């Protein structure tokens, strides 16, 4: 497939109903995909996510629309600003990267991540972080091409592992 050069990218306005509908639709599609856990978003998440996102200034999202497909929303990246105590600067965690199946492999994620990097730099962030599943080799290739590396402090101590505990 050829790369799409005519995407319309924007930072999501959480108060904009069109942006929020696109965000919810894309996020629900991602949640239903095996890479997102294969379960739809809960009714609670769908009902409360717009207000929850708008209430948190340390969150931001990017949308991609394809004008050639009637302005269809085709990509989403959700980001969370954190803080690096070692650098004493903000960092940005790329939390969700979503591209609809019809547009995968066409440069959508790359274009969105370029905008994410610009927005992170404008926030004074020292780095971007993200998690990726071991089986998602296309995403890993993209992230490496964009300069991401596995996290480690001392190679003798190995690479960091992403862990979770549900509360």
Where is each model-derived feature located?
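A conserved beta-strand-loop-helix scaffold within acyl/acetyltransferase catalytic domains
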Residues: 66, 79-86
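C-terminal "cap" of GNAT-fold acetyltransferases
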Residues: 3-9, 124-167
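Conserved acetyl-CoA binding element of GNAT-fold acetyltransferases
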Residues: 89-101
